[in-house]
Amino acid sequence: MQTPNNNGSTDSVLPPTSAGTTPPPPLQQSTPPPQQQQQQQWQQQQQWMAAMQQYPAAAMAMMQQQQMMMYPHPQYAPYNQAAYQQHPQFQYAAYQQQQQQHHQSQQQPRGGSGGDDVKTLWVGDLLHWMDETYLHTCFSHTNEVSSVKVIRNKQTCQSEGYGFVEFLSRSAAEEALQSFSGVTMPNAEQPFRLNWASFSTGEKRASENGPDLSIFVGDLAPDVSDAVLLETFAGRYPSVKGAKVVIDSNTGRSKGYGFVRFGDENERSRAMTEMNGAFCSSRQMRVGIATPKRAAAYGQQNGSQALTLAGGHGGNGSMSDGESNNSTIFVGGLDADVTEEDLMQPFSDFGEVVSVKIPVGKGCGFVQFANRQSAEEAIGNLNGTVIGKNTVRLSWGRSPNKQWRSDSGNQWNGGYSRGQGYNNGYANQDSNMYATAAAAVPGAS
């Protein structure tokens, strides 16, 4: 092991030897040949690893002392070259894509998912305290570490359990992969879990101008994180590019739903059928198409933004500006066997539901939320999903705070009017309605 001294150079320190044994001879002062130098470095690394396993407390103290000398500032400096120092934050989607391609590479021969220019390793099963400093220390003997990044949750700043180590050369990355895979991690009771990342961390993220191939995933358990959701889908569908669990900005907790972005339309279609009702953690997922136009980016900042809902058709009627506080949703195309309790379940994921009404024999229903934002989220995410046996179509319903008149004069719930016009369970609305719904999904950027 090499440790810095007061003069800025490094001294070689070997682990304690047992009594009666002859200590190893001191290192020669002359500079050894490169091949011998590499062999000596490798032997020192092995001795260091053995010492850490035999004397974990002393090894940790030495490691902490070394870290304090190298990085006195409480915030860890990134281990990288100038280019990385200018851009210390990596894009979320790019790393999520690397994460899914790691799962894909597990089913392929080593190196099959990358090319000869890939110099980045994926490191998984990280404990919560394992940060960039820890990973850099583990691989620093190669003297070729270019950058280190541990992926963290943007809301909690806690580690997601994986990260990336980029090397200066492909050969150095290969050596680290072969040497450390399965080796017990320093100061831990678990082995290194390594694999090739899909591409170098310095490459640009893919263009977001392609088709939107996202799905909505509801009924998520509270403990499901981005990484868990990603792993659930990426293990079966190699084209998965990212996953995002929507977090309540006020509580910091999951809202119980999220999005998964695909790169292949056929796989997305398969997932909507095969994964609907499948378990993720302790709950069965409810899967449907993600209707926001840019759901692949998991929404923009909080607030209302125009989007087009799938299946929108022109019709009669309009919504005046006075309806900006309307929180009632019309649900068309309902299965005749769906009860009000069945209808309430998927909508309750998005906020407090005030009332649910299903007029007899009309093939439709109404869901009223306590606030407009919850209704907007529900429309944006549930339109075109399956409830019961049918695919439903959502639009804004009649606000119960206005007295709507109809030819028949009949109303439901003091404000649900037949004047809305039922066409086999579908309400005739003007096309502008389908552009008024807004996604209120916290941004991933």
Curated annotation (Swiss-Prot):
One of its GO terms (molecular function) is poly(A) binding. GO terms for cellular component: cytoplasmic stress granule; nucleus. Residues 36-45, 93-108 have a biased composition (Low complexity). Its main location: nucleus. Residues 1-12 have a biased composition (Polar residues). Keywords: mRNA processing, Nucleus, Repeat, RNA-binding. PROSITE patterns: RRM (PS50102). Residues 1-45, 93-117 are annotated as: Disordered. Gene3D superfamilies: 3.30.70.330. Expressed in leaves, stems, flowers, and seedlings. It is found in: Nucleus; Cytoplasmic granule. Heterogeneous nuclear ribonucleoprotein (hnRNP)-protein binding the poly(A) tail of mRNA and probably involved in some steps of pre-mRNA maturation. This is Polyadenylate-binding protein RBP47A. It comes from Arabidopsis thaliana (Mouse-ear cress). The gene is RBP47A.
